[in-house]
């Protein structure tokens, strides 16, 4: 569903300019900036279970990598087009691991992402918005509970509390896996009705400081 294939050069140039400007702003503030190593995303990828015509990209490391303490965890990812996205960050993770004896590089079990992981025709255009909103309110999402699935961008950390959004890209088995993995943290599953396509908690709310968050009004708390 949706667009795939190369973006236009104009949009790529604009996006790169935005990223470069943001990087330069951080560097001027004394912050070290590392950038991922892109691969050719405009190529067909496959596993023994499926094929995808193209891949996604590597603009948001927040989607793939979850940092908690001295550990960086590679998420399972729930889109087939993002299955190999972790490769863009491996050079940096290798560098961090070699330079810091306390750094832990972990990877969640890679899912097979067979057809059993998705509800057939869930994204059909024939389904109206009211039905979709009812589905999300009932926690009935496009992904099933076939195997643990989660994107790192579905997790927000508040001290020892990890708040995890249950939605399109993270299922309950994925949340349970996180609970077992982060035994020193409290993991809370949350759901935000009001968005028919709930993906990623960082598009739901963002903590600013103690006692203050910014909330997406379409995903009411």
Place the predicted regions along the sequence by residue.
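The feature marks the mature, well-folded catalytic cores of soluble enzymes
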Residues: 1-221
